[in-house]
Structures are given as C-alpha cells and as structure tokens.
From Swiss-Prot:
Binding site residues for N(1)-(5-phospho-beta-D-ribosyl)glycinamide: 15-16, 75, 280, 350, 357-358
Catalytically driven reaction(s): N(1)-(5-phospho-beta-D-ribosyl)glycinamide + formate + ATP = N(2)-formyl-N(1)-(5-phospho-beta-D-ribosyl)glycinamide + ADP + phosphate + H(+)
Stated name of the protein: Formate-dependent phosphoribosylglycinamide formyltransferase
Any one Gene Ontology BP term: 'de novo' IMP biosynthetic process
GO molecular function: ATP binding; magnesium ion binding; phosphoribosylglycinamide formyltransferase 2 activity; phosphoribosylglycinamide formyltransferase activity
Assembly and interaction partners: Homodimer.
Any single Pfam family the record assigns to this protein: RS_preATP-grasp-like
Keywords, alphabetical: ATP-binding, Ligase, Magnesium, Metal-binding, Nucleotide-binding, Purine biosynthesis
Amino acid sequence: MTIFPKTLMLLGSGELGKEVAIAGKRLGCKVIACDRYEEAPAMQVADLAIVLDMNNHNSLQKTIRDYKPDVVIPEIEALAVEALKDIEKEGINVIPNARATAITMNRDQIRNLAAEKLAIKTANYGYASNIEELKEVSKKVGFPLLVKPVMSSSGKGQSLIKDKNDLEKAWDLAIKEARGDSKQVIIEEYINFDLEITLLTIKQSNHQTIFCPPIGHEQKGGDYQCSWQPQKLSFDQLKEAKSIAKKVTNELGGIGLFGVEFFIRGEEVIFSELSPRPHDTGLVTLISQNLNEFELHLRAILGLPIPSIECVSPSASRVILSQESFAKVAYKGIEKALEIQNSKIMIFGKPNTKKGRRMGVSLAQGKTLEEARFKADKSAKCIQIFEAKEAQS
C-alpha cells in the first residue's frame, strides 16, 4: 500500500507542470517546482520554487540530492540528462526513467528507435550536419519536406520547404533555434495527412498499458493550436495506433503517461513523435474525461489504481496566444468568454510574454465535436492580452 505524502520534484514548471502540481496537491503530495525563471506557472501552486539552470549537470544533480524527492518528474526536454542517469543510480525514481528522457529529447534517437530498431512506419527521413549535407539529403527525401533541429521543442526552428531555394534559410533557422550545442537537423518527408492524432498511453506499475480515447489536433509550425476528443478512427486504425504506442513505450520502459503522435493517411497509421509526459494536446482532457491526463500520469507514477477512463462529452480546446511582447501581462474579455455555456478559460499565469507565446487555453463541451470546437474557438477569441499598465489604466 502506498504511503503518503510523497515529495514530487518537477523539472520544468510550465502550464503542464502546473496541472501535475495541482493533481499532486490534491493527493496530499509535497511539490517542488523547478525552472529557469521565477514565477513560472507551476511555482505558483507548489510548496517550494527553485530557479536553476537545468541544463547544468552539477546544478541539477546538486538540487535533486539536496531535496531527495521521492519522484523526479521531467516536464521539459531541456535537461542535463546525464545528471538524471546518475541520480537514478542513487535510487531516486525518475519518470518514466532517465533513458527514456534522454532518447525522447533527441529527434534522431527516437526516430532511429522507432524506424530502425522497431521497424515502425514513419515519414522518410535523413540527417544533416551542414548545409551541403542538407542539400544532398533533400534530394533523396524529395520536396516538399520539413527541416527541424534534432533538439528543440514546441515547433521551434521548423520549416516546411517546397524547393531547394529555401534550404539555406531553413538551415539557419534550425541552427538558431536548436537547443543546446546541437548542429544537426532532421529532414523529413512531408506527409499529406488526413488527420493528426495523439494517443495518450499510460504504463502502470502493474505492467498494464491503457489508453485514452484518441485526440485529434491541429498544429501550426509544429506547435499545437487546437485539439478535440474523441476523434473517431476505424477499428483497424485504432488497433494499429495502440499496437505501435505499446511497442515504443515498452521499449522505452518506465511508468507514467506518454503522448504518442501519429499521422493518419487513408487507413495508414504513421508514427510521428513521442513525449514521455503529459501532452499539450491533452489539455482537452481537463474537460473531456473523468480523469484528466495529469491525474492519470500521477496515478501511474504513484502506483494508484485507474478503474476506467471515460470520455464524458465531446470536447475541444483552443490555445490563447499573445500577439506581442510584454514585460507584465493583463487580460480582458474573460467575462465574455465565460458566458459561453459549458466552457472554461485557463490563464496559465506566465509572468511575461512574447509574440506567439501560449498564455492560456479555452476548453468547451458540446453535443457534437463541431459544437465543442466552435465554442472553444469563440471563447478563445474573447480574450485580449495587454501590457499590464495599459490594461489597468
């Protein structure tokens, strides 16, 4: 039987980490929220906030050793993963495990694991370490294609390229936006898909793997814009998606919730990416499911039962993006947004913003997916983001 309270350390304290922290507090856990900047969203609901450079091996290792949490929960990719491997050897539980965290932060490693080791269908791809290699690989992959940094997150540094004339610009952007010292890009065939989905996959300590109903989503520049649930798939499509998700997560090992992304093209199910943590497209589960993805993640981590996962209503989400950069932020239109029946607004509480930064999300239920998506879109459009002093004048 699990003894509470547990101490959870979040590595990354953004909006997803905030919901993990809230789920943890509801179970009586102590939450330590870490990030590179003050007043990050999860810090606002945690017992303790720590600002540090999580890419610094010694700093990250010392922080974990000093506080000795029961569980370390990475929420972002930008981490000194070698430090996590050392900590894991000392008996501290890293979720899902240090190896999975390392593999999934690098597009080349997770792609090689899926396509080469596990023989899973993916887009055609190749790698380049300089502009000349990029030009050569592009000839083999064929246009249109995508150029992405091997290490980045939230679509940063991605370009859709239709011909060779834009390759140098794509290279420059990818290297500029790459995380860490990586100077490598992945070149991917552009899949003319019918649909993109996320299959939230939960690996439990009892060795069972369970799934949430599929989530449909749209991205722009590789970054989530809206999502909806449940997304209908054929019997064969869902069976294949579950089979692939289970195969990849079994290879990675560990416990917790994984966000596994797929392209759907006709009856084809094509593996895209994987995150070993709650997924941004899964924010819709805060209104669509009996247990949201953050609660499911923690139940799996802490060895707690998950009797069932049910979709309670057709539901949708739409991100609320800032159009400008502000040192301090204020909002208008929340009253208008909340006039929409069966809708919610979540403001993440980020202390400042820049153009295109995700500052909140609207959530809505409907009798149909179409109604839910319409309401979520309408609600999000109500929210205006201002510089704080301007909004308060």
